[in-house]
Amino acid sequence: MGHVIIVGAGPAGVATAFLLAQRGLQVSLLEQETQFDRVFRGEGLMPSGVAALEEMGLADCLAGIPQRRLDAWDFYIDQHRRMRVVEPQGAPGQIPTHLIHQSALLKAIVERSQNLPNFQFYPGWQVQALVSEGDRLQGVKARCGGESRDFTGDL
């Protein structure tokens, strides 16, 4: 079984970690922050994002997460609204764009991943350097508080 080191528990990092661990690879997910509750950008979840979560088997992670339907986009210049574009709602049954609490979604996916025996989450670990031998990248050197450690893997 291969071992994968993933640096960063953003949307791509947590989704990749979950999928690889679900498929049997050993996964170590490192995140420099100790909590997910921080300011994020891009908290809009488009219909394709919801579809991707459904395909990964993570749609239920959306339940209970603060969210609201996006009705329109307002464009401001010099603090004056210049244009409003109504968000198309699509056909009945089509998923609309939602504004979500991204940190709650990331936390839910990590919690789901922690149910897998081959997944390890390392909050508070900040990557300092790459670890290599010859031409091969083997992992990362990371620090958490006063502790320093090498995380090595196959991929």
Annotate each language-model stretch with its function:
Residues 2, 24, 153-154:
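Short, well-ordered alpha-helix to beta-strand connector turns
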Residues 14-15, 48:
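Short alpha-helical segment within the catalytic ATP-binding CA
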Residues 51, 59-155:
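Conserved N-terminal helical subregion
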Residues 1-12:
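Beta1/beta-strand and adjacent pyrophosphate-binding region of the FAD-binding site
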Residues 21-41:
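Glycine-rich FAD pyrophosphate-binding loop
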Residues 34-54:
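Conserved N-terminal glycine-rich FAD pyrophosphate-binding loop of Rossmann-like flavoproteins
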Residues 3, 26-28, 120:
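Structural signature of beta-strand start/N-cap positions in the alpha/beta core
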